[in-house]
Amino acid sequence: MLLALSPEASALRERLEKFVNERCIPAEEEYDRHIAQFSGPDRWTPDAVPPAIERLKSEARSLGLWNLFLPRPVPDHLLVDDDDGGGSHTMAPSMYLSNREYGMLCEVMGRSSLAPEACNCSAPDTGNMEVLLKHGTEYQQSEYLKPLLRGETRSAFLMTEPDVASSDARNLRTRLTKVTAAGVGEDGVGVGGGGGARYVLNGRKWWSTGAMDPRCGFALVVAEVDTGRPPAPSKEEEGRSGRRRRGGDQTVVIVPMSHPGVRCVRPLTVFGYDDAPHGHAEVSLDDVELDGSAVILGEGRGFEISQSRLGPGRIHHCEFSDCWGFRGRSTAFFLPVFPTAHSMLPIICHLLTLLSM
């Protein structure tokens, strides 16, 4: 039995299906043609961003298909001066969905590679927006969350490192060193807008999705706070020495990509594809100076933040990937053999949704 949606969510899903089938999928060829015009370094310039994506984003807003992922209402202080002229807000979704309801919309968006970004529901932005919405200060929300909610910028999440097994965040070696703590509150964030605490960030990250994008305005970076203690041992060292690894020093900070200490070393490829102009970068962080306003939630809260970010995001990724993969397989193998079987696609996609959940 297929999962039932409320009448409101069902109408939203039908509107989304029409948008994906009639606008996003036909635009994929135009998108690819534009990207094919660029080669080398110019693949990471603003000109390489296909105009089709901004056109689709504008259409999604007008259809009420914008920011569908949002799990909670947008704070009132962000909605000031955010009226589209018709009495509605451009950042808030047309309705707030449960995780199950949003999952069923993800399988619709997953049918087109353009639909998630067109609806402002693509990674890593969704996870970063959820973090800032749940844990960010008013300053962090106004400065970084608001442009993302409006679709004016992109972002990245920097966690994985080249020299360690980064699936265990206790292995991370990127260091956040506090150089002064004058005027710091109990939560470790500078008093009066973050003007007290000062930090220096050093390290190297890779597979940083979105960091190469010319629209990327900032990154959330997971780092270990330098407390003056020796670095935590690796898993192998832990076994040899018996010294336990710590888990309470990981901290998430906001780093502007325009900072002179931030350098995208190179784009990385997946099966030979660089995914320009979005991309997956190796990023060098050299003496990146930050103040207390860059710290999210406080020192040592990185695990808490990462769990709240990565949990729902993985489910959404599965929804997108299942249906995008099914569309490719059905086009190559299924429909040419059974050309009248397209009526079964919605049922099969629903079953994929159930399996993913």
Residue ranges and their predicted role:
Residues M1-S122, E143, P147, G185-G194, ...:
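Amphipathic, small/basic residue-rich leader segments at the start of a protein or domain
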Residues P7, A11, C264-P346, H350, ...:
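Glycine-rich beta->alpha junctions and the first turn(s) of the following alpha-helix
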Residues G64, L105-G110, V222-V225, V255-V262, ...:
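Short Ser/Thr-interspersed hydrophobic loop/turn segments at strand-loop and sheet-helix junctions
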Residues E117-Y139, D168:
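N-terminal glycine-rich flavin-associated loop
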Residues G151-T160:
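A short, Trp-centered hydrophobic/proline-enriched beta-strand micro-motif
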Residues A165, W206-D213, G311-H317:
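Glycine-rich phosphate/pyrophosphate-binding beta-alpha loops
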Residues T174-A181:
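A structural signal for short hydrophobic beta-strand segments in well-ordered beta-sheet cores
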Residues A197-R198, N202-V265:
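A short core secondary-structure module
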